[in-house]
A protein has these predicted regions:
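N-terminal single-pass transmembrane signal-anchor helix
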Residues: 1-22
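N-terminal export/assembly leader peptides and their processing motifs that target proteins to secretory
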Residues: 18-172
Length: 172
């Protein structure tokens, strides 16, 4: 009987360890107060050039953003991902499907900072209607840097209209 009980305990410990890997972990989230504001977005349909001015109006540094556009006024959420069309410069690079605002791969886009980014889109895309930007950050978990999307801090704006600044636009 002792061997039978020991064998049952051993199997239950193994099953527990195996099932523990199936339990979802808490996802990494950005801190409250992360925010990027689209100050201006202008599109020239003849050249296919989209110029976006973003400003960090939050309380924390960010690393960059995901960017989506729509070319249909009936589409509520922009879904065309355009980071691959980024015109890279000495401060801005592509990072996967996002735009990284630092060559060092850190959260260097400080509150109050502004950046102008140019996207050279194909002229066959048509007229763009709206833009959506979702901030990104590098968060540290278990001594590892993880790239995190701040989906709850995303902003959307109609292209060609100036962004509306609130009292939080100062970054304070």
């Amino acid at each position: 009987y002792v061997l039978l009980i020991a064998f049952a305990i051993l199997i239950s410990a193994g099953v527990y360890a195996w099932l523990k890997t199936y339990v979802p972990r808490e996802p990494l989230n950005c801190p409250d107060g992360v925010s990027i504001f689209v100050k201006e977005a202008g599109f020239n349909s003849s050249t296919g050039q989209l110029i976006v001015t973003v400003r960090n109006n939050g309380r924390f540094n960010t690393a960059g953003y995901f960017i989506y556009v729509s070319n249909n006024s009936a589409q509520k959420n922009p879904s065309i991902e355009i980071s691959n069309y980024l015109q890279e410069d000495e401060q801005t690079v592509k990072f996967g499907n996002s735009v990284l605002l630092s060559l060092t791969g850190d959260n260097s886009f400080s509150p109050g900072d502004e950046r102008i980014n140019v996207f050279n889109l194909s002229t066959g895309m048509g007229e763009l209607f709206s833009i959506r930007i979702i901030p990104t950050r590098f968060q540290e978990e278990e001594n590892k840097k993880r790239f995190v999307s701040c989906g709850n801090a995303g902003v959307q704006q109609i292209i060609g209209e100036p962004g509306m600044c609130t009292s939080q636009c100062t970054g304070k």
